[in-house]
Design a protein with these regions (language model features):
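Alpha-helical solenoid scaffolds in large eukaryotic transport, assembly, and signaling factors
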Residues: 1-118
Length: 118
């Protein structure tokens, strides 16, 4: 099973009150995984990801990137920011509004952090 399908399934379990606690634990584990930024961005830009999965992946990307902002370096900061803004601008009409708003909020947070880091 691809990671995007697994993440979709995890997000579905997160929305179900019966399986929410276990799914939340797995989402928290995902935030600590090795390639979390790359994986979360892959979910965001995937055509197979659900809107809720894209929303959650964007939240993970934002939180992890901001927590490790100085460690990830300027080049990676710029790459993530530009990749997300390009994606949302290119696909704006196809994205659910709550997803595009979350991505734009994340990009704005990254620009603000970069500006305050000067």
């Amino acid at each position: 099973m691809s990671f995007v399908k697994e993440f979709n399934a995890l997000c579905d379990r997160f929305r179900d009150p019966k399986t929410r606690i276990e799914a939340e634990r797995k989402l928290l584990e995902f935030r600590k995984s090795r390639n979390v930024l790359e994986q979360s961005i892959n979910v965001v830009v995937s055509k197979n990801a659900t809107g809720f999965a894209k929303f959650q992946a964007t939240s993970v990307c934002r939180d992890v990137a901001l927590e490790s902002w100085m460690r990830i370096g300027t080049q990676k900061q710029n790459t993530i920011r530009e990749h997300l803004i390009t994606y949302v601008v290119t696909n704006y009409n196809d994205l659910e509004k709550f997803v595009s708003k979350q991505i734009l909020h994340t990009v704005a947070s990254f620009y603000k952090r970069a500006w305050t880091s000067l």
